[in-house]
Amino acid sequence: MRRALSLLGVVLALCAATPSAQTPPKTLDIYYVDTEGGQATPFVSPTGQTVLVDTGNANPPGRDPQRIMEAMKAAGAKQIDYLVMTHYHGDHVGGFEELAKLTKIAHIIDHGPTVQPEQKHDAYDQALKTTPYTVAKPGDKVPVTGIDWLIVSAAGKTLKTNVAGAPGAGKPNPYCAEFKPKDIQSDLENGQSTGSLITYGKFRTIDLGDLLWNVEFDLMCPTNRIGTVDLYLTSHHGVDWSGSSTLVHALAPRVAIMNNGTRKGGQIAVDEVLESSPGLEDLWQLHWSFNGVTEHNPPGRFIANIEDAATTAAIVANPPPPATQPLGPPVPRAGGAGGAGGRAGGPAAAAPGAPQLGNPAHSPAYWLKVSAQNDGTFTVFNPRNGFSKTYKPRS
């Protein structure tokens, strides 16, 4: 009996000495909040710090800030330790005023003065007078414990040194040879976007805001300074002013997430670049895309928000004309959302006779959640249908 008790004691002691076997690994959690074609992305570090990239739209009033708060509550986040504002179009900064009433924003990081004075936001400008504030430059770090947050673009400038230790960084980019510049107005806030490369152990993800096509060349050529990534947030919501093969194919992401709206982004040219990207396993989207029609949307389990069956049938029966993007001045910020149909704001208007899609206040609205481990494993979860997929580290 004593021998049996002694052996039992050894077993219990061993179990007590190895709690890690029972404890889930700490993760970097990312919530791609549905802002109907804008951006609001909370990152919650393994130590509990929260970095929010952008604040979504102003209209409908309170919608996007409330969705951000719901994601933060789900993550157990108490405040925003750092707000990284990519640029000042209404679909990225519009929710700031209401969000600041709902939670503490401890520190703001942005690219500095706007290049489009008509895009000024008084509440944001006032907050900069009382909130700790940093103007980002390529090469700067956001001091988040346990992860490496590197600024790779800001104010039209890009990183000029190779990311130390990054897989593939410093090698010639073969996709530079196929780059063709686009005739895109250069003095836009999009091209000023504060872009971030976030690394947690062996997991790497990149968020470039709305960085423009021609600036992507400056970042990635002639040398790939970034290296490869595991997860790519499609630039500019999947609008074809961004997302060149020179960028995407060199990054060689395993997974892409598109923060599109029903009628904004998801353009076929962007989809084709993704579909031909070496090593891409899956595309996830916040919305079923009218622009992508049936041929280019991913399977439904990879989409956070889907229209009802009757609306989807109408989309299939009435495919849209080829999408175009205006090259003229920005549409005025009606209600602070960057314009109703311009490149900077909410979903584009439906073509005459096309089905009206995308209830802008629909509820519930679903995010996509990514949980990344420091060994490079990450899982994408779709709460609409409970579907998740885990991606093991690159071999």
Regions found by a protein language model. Give the residues of each.
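Active-site metal-binding motif and surrounding structural segment of the metallo-beta-lactamase
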Residues: 25, 46-52, 56-110, 114, ...
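Divalent metal-coordination and catalytic microenvironments
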Residues: 33-34, 43, 54, 87, ...
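Acidic/histidine-rich helix-loop elements
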Residues: 52-66, 161-185, 236-241, 263
